[in-house]
Swiss-Prot record:
This is 33 kDa chaperonin. InterPro entries: Heat_shock_Hsp33, Heat_shock_Hsp33_C, Heat_shock_Hsp33_N, Hsp33_helix_hairpin_bin_dom_sf. Disulfide bonds join 229-231, 262-265. Keywords: Chaperone, Cytoplasm, Disulfide bond, Redox-active center, Zinc. One of its GO terms (biological process) is protein refolding. It is found in: Cytoplasm. Under oxidizing conditions two disulfide bonds are formed involving the reactive cysteines. Under reducing conditions zinc is bound to the reactive cysteines and the protein is inactive.
Length: 291
């Protein structure tokens, strides 16, 4: 398996473009930060694959956030990815969740929020109802209504060689007016034959050849996908000094230290009374080192 890679490809004669995402370590890092139930791990994997596929459509510097919200036992699953394919994610749940729980079992009545944030330009946000049995179907409906581009997604989460992995494919008509519905349906039928093990394990070139060996496929340079939460001790320190000193002193008196926990990666940053005093000292504003 080409670990943690995004591959873009184009059917030049058919005006259809495609994407392939294969993840192992990046997905494993994301689900290891908390003791997620198996079904929640699966949903995180699906949303992670979907986010990487959608982030690949960005034609500018920026990020996409996919956020599932609901009134069920899983209240939130959120994945953020940027144009450099740096991703992070977290989920909120309560109670016991069956291993075979479906999307609707977990979220109940809910929706998907898609937020696109360019570094320059206006922020866009769309809200999509959970229409369909799977996340892939929900997103296909979104593309049909908002982009008016025929789009299909295949998203799989499972294990390969005993390790968690997630993968997916996307097909979309290129908006040049040349792609036909018949050509797209032909490629859909070919892609429907993909097996989980092939999607998890085969190199991109071999996988695409198995599926589309009668077609002319242009495969572009792949892009690495990496887990990056963005937390640091410095950022935690900066957050502490935004809180009133009296409130921080109360925490120190009660707990002996101020601790900030990153839900994305599971790291806890702890500051004792001496370190807190250093943060509030005038010299800290001039770039003193945090230990």
């Amino acid at each position: 398996m080409a670990n943690n890679m995004l591959h873009r490809y184009l059917f030049k004669d058919l005006s259809v473009r495609g994407e392939l995402v294969q993840l192992d370590d990046t997905y494993q890092q994301m689900i290891s930060s908390q003791e997620y139930p198996a079904a929640v791990q699966h949903l995180i994997g699906e949303l992670l694959v979907a986010t990487s596929l959608l982030t690949a459509t960005l034609k500018f510097e920026g990020s996409i956030t996919l956020q599932l919200q609901g009134n069920g036992p899983v209240s939130l699953v959120v994945i953020n990815g940027d144009n450099n394919q740096q991703v992070r994610g977290v989920a909120r749940w309560k109670g016991d969740i069956a291993d075979d729980a479906s999307l609707h079992d977990m979220l109940g009545k809910g929706h998907l929020v898609i937020t696109i944030e360019p570094k320059q330009g206006e922020r866009y946000q769309g809200v999509v109802g959970l229409e369909g049995d799977t996340l892939a179907q929900v997103l296909e409906g979104y593309f049909e209504r908002s982009e008016q581009l025929k789009t299909r997604l295949w998203i799989r989460v499972g294990k390969h060689d005993g390790k968690a992995c997630a993968a997916g494919m996307l097909l979309q008509i290129v908006p040049d007016g040349k792609g036909s519905a018949e050509d797209f349906e032909h490629l859909e039928q070919l892609t429907n034959t993909i097996k989980d093990e092939e999607l998890f394990a085969l190199p991109a070139e071999e996988l695409l050849y198995r599926l589309y060996n009668q077609e002319t496929v242009q495969l572009f340079t792949p892009q690495q996908i990496s887990f990056r939460c963005g937390c640091s001790r410095e950022r935690s320190a900066a957050a502490i000094v935004t809180v009133a000193r009296e409130e921080i002193n109360d925490i120190l008196a009660q707990d002996g230290a101020v601790a900030l926990h990153c839900d994305y990666c599971g790291t806890t940053y702890s500051f004792d009374s001496a370190q807190v005093a250093e943060l509030y000292a005038p010299s800290s504003a001039n770039g003193s080192t945090l230990h």
